């Protein structure tokens, strides 16, 4: 763990996959990852209830309904962002999920609007309907519209303009709700600025590409002054985690894990060697988790970690 207190959200998983697929494939997690929220996609209350019940049995702390994904595939399934047109149906879904998983918080993630709509009121109506008809009190708001036509999912994360002011206004008008802002947030200073207006901040791609951004979050945002994880500790934990996953015999190979580690040494001398070694097909083929430590040695030699923080030797 880089941060002990920050919530981790899974990728969106179709409720049908959870119900009819291999539950371990979609729901199994490491106990050290908590608090963790499972994000579900779907629009059938009964299916979402079944998926929520399974998630609760796997120890998830929260179950989040995605009402923000704009991809054509998701639209064909009549869920994701297009659900913002169906607040009553979303309410039925949330209520069914909560009844099936009473020990979990049930939340919703959505956009500020659809297509090129610029009026604030439909957003307020959507949130107001859910606040009135369900026990949901946490709303994670991506501060962009979802364009249902004309943009790819990737473009939908960048092209529609950000309207942070709409999310701030939601918090002012619904002070009893927990409003969490998402979209285009990349630095700790930006996080701190948003927290002057809303209850929480969700950071997505920046954490994936630069995970050590999270290293100081416990101190900065949770008041936990314990020493953050060192780079050396993290490399050792990654090696142990990879070894455990390989030993579990579920078909996982080192390449499947290592590709998600590439950003961990972002900004350090030797980061290029780290990325190269952990993406080299020949080096990965033996499935030897010690490769992680060998890659770490390249970074360690190129930086001074004597006081716990890296100082480039160049």
PLM ranges: what are they?
Residues 92-95, 99-101, 105, 114-116, ...:
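Alpha/beta catalytic cores of nucleotide-metabolism and tRNA/nucleoside-modifying enzymes
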Residues 35-107, 111-119:
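Active-site beta->alpha loop and helix N-cap motifs at the rims of alpha/beta catalytic domains
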Residues 72-89, 120-121, 150-163, 223-225:
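Glycine-rich tight-turn/loop motif centered on a GG-T
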Residues 18, 73, 116, 149, ...:
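Glycine/Thr-rich phosphate-binding loops of Rossmann-like dinucleotide-binding domains
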Residues 1-61:
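Glycine-rich, positively charged N-terminal anion/phosphate-binding segment
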Residues 13-15, 41-43, 68-70, 111-115, ...:
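Active-site beta-loop-alpha junctions enriched in small/polar residues
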């Amino acid at each position: 763990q880089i941060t002990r207190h920050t919530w981790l959200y899974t990728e969106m998983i179709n409720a049908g996959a959870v119900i009819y697929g291999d539950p371990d494939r979609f729901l199994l997690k490491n106990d050290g990852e908590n608090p963790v929220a499972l994000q579900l996609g779907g629009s059938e209350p009964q299916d979402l209830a079944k998926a929520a019940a399974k998630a609760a049995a796997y120890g998830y702390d929260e179950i989040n309904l995605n009402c923000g994904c704009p991809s054509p595939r998701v639209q064909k399934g009549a869920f994701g962002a297009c659900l913002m047109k169906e607040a009553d149906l979303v309410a039925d879904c949330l209520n069914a999920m909560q009844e099936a998983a009473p020990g979990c918080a049930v939340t919703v993630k959505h956009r500020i609007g659809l297509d090129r709509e610029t009026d604030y009121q439909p957003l307020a109506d959507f949130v107001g309907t859910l606040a009135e008809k369900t026990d949901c009190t946490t709303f994670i708001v991506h501060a962009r519209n979802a364009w249902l036509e004309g943009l790819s999912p990737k473009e939908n994360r960048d092209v529609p303009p950000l309207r942070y002011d709409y999310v701030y206004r939601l918090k002012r008008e619904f002070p009893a709700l927990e409003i969490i802002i998402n979209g285009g947030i990349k630095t700790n200073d930006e996080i701190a600025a948003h927290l002057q207006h809303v209850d929480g901040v969700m950071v997505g791609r920046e954490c994936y590409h630069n995970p050590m951004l999270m290293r100081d979050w416990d101190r900065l945002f949770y008041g936990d002054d314990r020493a953050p994880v060192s780079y050396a500790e993290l490399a050792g934990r990654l090696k142990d985690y990879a070894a455990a996953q390989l030993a579990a015999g579920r078909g996982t190979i080192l390449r499947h894990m290592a590709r998600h580690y590439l950003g961990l040494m972002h900004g350090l001398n030797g980061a290029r060697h780290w990325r190269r070694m952990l993406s080299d097909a020949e080096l990965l083929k033996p499935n030897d988790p010690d490769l992680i430590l060998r890659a770490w040695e390249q970074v360690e030699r190129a930086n001074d970690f004597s006081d716990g923080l890296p100082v480039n030797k160049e």
